[in-house]
Regions:
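Intrinsically disordered, low-complexity regions enriched in Pro/Ser/Thr/Gly and acidic residues
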Residues: 71-173, 182
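Aromatic-residue detector
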Residues: 11-13, 29, 40, 171-174
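Short, structured protein-protein interaction patches enriched in aromatics and acidic/basic residues
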Residues: 55-76
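N-terminal single-pass transmembrane signal-anchor helix
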Residues: 1-28
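An almost-null, non-specific background feature
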Residues: 13-19, 33, 49, 136
Length: 183
């Protein structure tokens, strides 16, 4: 009889502990504040100009794995999504528009998603992508970059997550850097 009571006490204790843990986890979940579409457009301009600035409210940060392809050579990269609750019902795919960042929205949230930045001086092609270890940000700053790939190519084709980003004729040294976004 005592073994049944012990088993029941253990099961009951486990159920209670599970409820307490799930409650504590929900307390730590950060819900972003709502933000206007216009405010996100201003954030986009600052990000595309690589400025350090304060955000109007805390943004949730999500980092997604991505693939950078240089003439068939795959380089592991990432995309950073900064998002807030949306006041408007907007859906934007976050398509690549030739800049490092683009607008993104899904009816509930609105934000910006990173792509890659490319600088070509005719000799060296520098490609930058972004990452972050933060869960949320109130301020945008950039840490020093980390070189993740060096190479040299003739007639280079660059794609990012399956999207053709650029094609360069002639010989280029290529440098791929990862820049971390901090708060």
């Amino acid at each position: 009889m005592k073994s049944i009571e012990l088993v029941l006490a253990l099961v009951l204790s486990a159920i209670i502990a599970g409820y307490i843990i799930s409650y504590l986890i929900s307390l730590n979940r950060v819900e972003p504040k709502e933000i206007t579409f216009h405010a996100v457009e201003e954030i986009l301009v600052n990000l595309n100009n690589f400025k350090e600035f304060s955000l109007p409210s805390r943004a949730l940060v999500e980092v997604k794995p991505a693939t950078l392809v240089l003439n068939g050579i795959e380089v592991n990269a990432s995309q950073v999504l900064l998002m807030w609750k949306s006041e408007e019902n907007v859906v934007l795919q976050g398509a690549y528009k030739g800049e490092a960042w683009s607008l993104w929205a899904n009816n509930s949230y609105i934000g910006v998603i990173s792509w890659i930045a490319i600088q070509d001086n005719g000799v060296e092609l520098k490609i930058v992508f972004f990452t972050s270890s933060e869960k949320e940000l109130k301020h945008i700053s950039y840490s020093s970059s980390k070189v993740v790939f060096r190479g040299a190519f003739r007639n280079l084709r660059v794609s990012f997550n399956g999207i053709k980003v650029c094609e360069v004729e002639g010989f280029r040294k290529v440098l791929v850097e990862e820049i971390s976004i901090k708060g």
